[in-house]
UniProtKB/Swiss-Prot annotation:
One of its GO terms (biological process) is translation. GO terms for molecular function: rRNA binding; structural constituent of ribosome; tRNA binding. This is one of the proteins that bind and probably mediate the attachment of the 5S RNA into the large ribosomal subunit, where it forms part of the central protuberance. In the 70S ribosome it contacts protein S13 of the 30S subunit (bridge B1b), connecting the 2 subunits; this bridge is implicated in subunit movement. Contacts the P site tRNA; the 5S rRNA and some of its associated proteins might help stabilize positioning of ribosome-bound tRNAs. The keyword DNA-binding does not apply. This is Large ribosomal subunit protein uL5.
Length: 180
């Protein structure tokens, strides 16, 4: 069992139940999955660069990424149907908790001028953020990076509101901006 999952089962569940007054233990929010995605439309023109970004995403996540393809052709963007334009990875279970632990304790402190993430979610218990650079991850070899590439990370929880979601993620170690 990962350190973060153990912390969740022993401490975080109890503090969430006390704070929000859940009557049933099944109401307590749980982290269901983490989705990491990269839009690689620019890199799609260069197969070596596209492959390099796929390798970086697999090193960051620990599993092989799914290549997302264009649904239809758009001549103005020089895009053909079926052409790879992105990649995504869905983390669940142990890998999800390990990634969350690494992201909170190793990666986010490496972000330049980091003062915390925004507390705004989607209103339905999910939280997303965008990173501008993949080089903040220690798994990425800086000498092999040909072009900086951003990514989107989405935390999907069973929380019903943004307050429940951000409280859960904050207790798990994600740092948010303090309200002024």
């Amino acid at each position: 069992m990962s350190r973060l999952k153990k912390l969740y089962t022993e401490e975080i569940r109890k503090s969430l139940q006390e704070k929000f007054g859940y009557t049933n233990t099944m109401q307590i929010p749980v982290l269901k999955k983490i989705v990491i995605s990269m839009g690689l439309a620019e890199a799609a023109k260069d197969k070596n660069l596209f492959q390099a970004h796929l390798e970086e995403l697999s090193m960051i996540s620990g599993q092989k990424p799914l290549v997302t393809k264009a649904r239809n052709s758009i001549a103005g963007f020089k895009l053909r149907e079926g052409q790879g334009i992105g990649a995504k990875v869905t983390l669940r279970g142990e890998r999800m908790y390990d990634f969350m632990d690494r992201f909170c304790n190793i990666v986010s402190p490496r972000i330049r001028d980091f003062r915390g993430f925004s507390k705004k979610g989607d209103g339905r218990g999910c939280y997303s953020l965008g990173l501008e650079d993949q080089q903040i991850f220690p798994e990425v070899d800086l000498d092999r990076v040909k072009r900086t590439q951003g990514m989107n990370i989405t935390w999907v929880t069973t929380a019903q509101t943004d307050a429940e979601c951000t409280t859960l993620l904050e207790l798990m170690g994600l740092r948010f901006k303090k309200a002024q």
